[in-house]
Amino acid sequence: MKNYIDGGEAILEAFRQLDIDYVIASPGSEWGSVWEAFARQEREKTEGPKYLNCAHETLAVDLAIGYSVMTGRMQAVMLHTGVGLLQGSIGIDTAYRQSVPMVVVSGESLSYSEHDGFDPGPQWHGVLSVVGGPTVLASGITKWSQSVSSQHTLYEQLIRAGEMAQRSPAGPVYMSVPIETMLHDWTPPQAPRAVPPAPKPVPPAKDIEAVADMLLNAKNPAIVAESIGRDPAGYSATVELSEMLAIPVSECRWLDFTNFPKEHPMYQGMGEPDYLKDCDVVLTLRARAPWTPPSAKPANAKIVNIDETPFRPHMVHQSLQADIFLEGDAIATLQSLNSIIRDRIVDAEVSQRWEKWSKVHNDMVARNKAIEADGLSKETITPIGLCATLSALLPDEAVFVDETITHRPIIIRHLDYRGPRSFYTAATGGLGQGLGLALGTKLARPDCFVVSVIGDGSFMYNPVVQSLTLSKHEELPIFVVIFNNMGYSAMRKEHHSYYPNGLAANNSTSVGHTITDMDYAELARAFGFYGRKVDRLIELENAIKEGQRAVCSGQTAILNVVLDEGDTSI
């Protein structure tokens, strides 16, 4: 039995040095060298990443995203040449847009069976080759894409890729690794260096002090947050700043993460509240699109933007309208700002602001509760009634992973989630990722009750069979709640808004809206999971409790909730 030390070992050793927990794979035939290295790792009891096999590329990438979002730790994804890269591209694009670090690798062949004594297989020259190499497929959705140069550079190129992925702005990087390179002998470095964490640069102290002075002198400041809450430290720093100066906090329409406690007196909801027009200083925290249209900034306010990368390279149009940019690590910058304000004498007007915004918050809560009470008074199930019932029954520590479109504003307003990382959404426009993100969340937090709230249209885009298979084999039970409005409501809404007096609007039809009716709960039973369809409010509480018990016993549950089409709030 020969012990091969080749390019496969170089790849695995690079992942070890990058402190990666999982190599998540939907692989192809090129990865024999890496599998051999994993076999060696197991035989020799070497510490290193675990290998997790998926049956779908998008699922593999989304598992890595969900895991990284919940842990703050970069993971690796292994795909099959260009075709696998294309299949996983929607997930890679999400990672790019949400600044999730990730090392993505796929293989290629350079010899195409022309090398005497080595035949990678006829598929490489016949159907799998990509003109220009697979890197051309990844260049628009990654920070950096490159083919490995040789067996001599393989290890350090992967290390560099991982370091680059974690540098600001964080994001996925891609490397194509030729089979021929992986099969070459490799000599490990005698003293491999420990890869240091990425630095966290902050703006100049004088700039932070100037913003502190602005906030201390402001009569009517406000905070607009989009994704500062992705890290619990950002969530806590936002709360501290708001409390010190009694600053109201609203969340952007396209929030990716919960950023502020919904029950806090300074929380003012989601969207673009009217009070922004009267503010004199508005602080935007990791906000790529704080208002719509982009040019419609609060007219009377000085805008201060705190972000690692204010100008997102993936956005075609972005008009932040900021007067001051504190560009650098957003959390470290916010913490520095807090430390300055903490040592200053706070104006007496702060207590008056606290009273004012507490009342506004309480009024908002009262309105929401009244709306929820109305939803709970009906025989059918409205989206608001569903959110209120889930809030009443599910544990406070539950994590909600959202992939809805039309119902997202309702969910954000009426679903009670508590604490940092309790709500996460892939708000990039690319559907078909909710189940993978939820499973990645469960992989990262196995003791947590994870809920996938997902529209019926979004559900249909997901690799459902592969996701349920992974859930079963890896023992990752999640609670899937389908907001089933029996169609693509977002498509119908936009169609009718473009043609309000058109044929479709006047006849209540839309060819782009229809989804073939099916009972999604039946899919659960094929895997031995819990599944139930419910369309009456009187049945909902029991169905949720049954699903919760199933998840707590180790089974994934799918609750197909048929919503009242008469609900005009959507």
Summary of predicted features, one role per range:
Residues 1-345, 393-396, 449, 468, ...:
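N-terminal alpha/beta PP-like core and its mobile active-site loop of ThDP/TPP-dependent enzymes
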Residues 226-231, 375, 455-457:
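Conserved short loop/turn motifs at secondary-structure junctions
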Residues 115-128, 276-278, 318-319, 327, ...:
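Thiamine diphosphate
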Residues 107, 285, 306-307, 402, ...:
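Active-site flanking residues adjacent to catalytic metal/cofactor-binding acidic residues
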Residues 5, 28, 205, 232, ...:
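Conserved structured core elements
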Residues 176-180, 226-227, 403-407, 561-564:
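Short, well-ordered beta-to-alpha junction loops that form the rim of enzyme active sites
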Residues 1-2, 149-152, 300-404, 508, ...:
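Phosphate/pyrophosphate-binding active-site segments
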Residues 8-18, 29-30, 34-38, 359-447:
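Active-site diphosphate/adenylate-binding microenvironment
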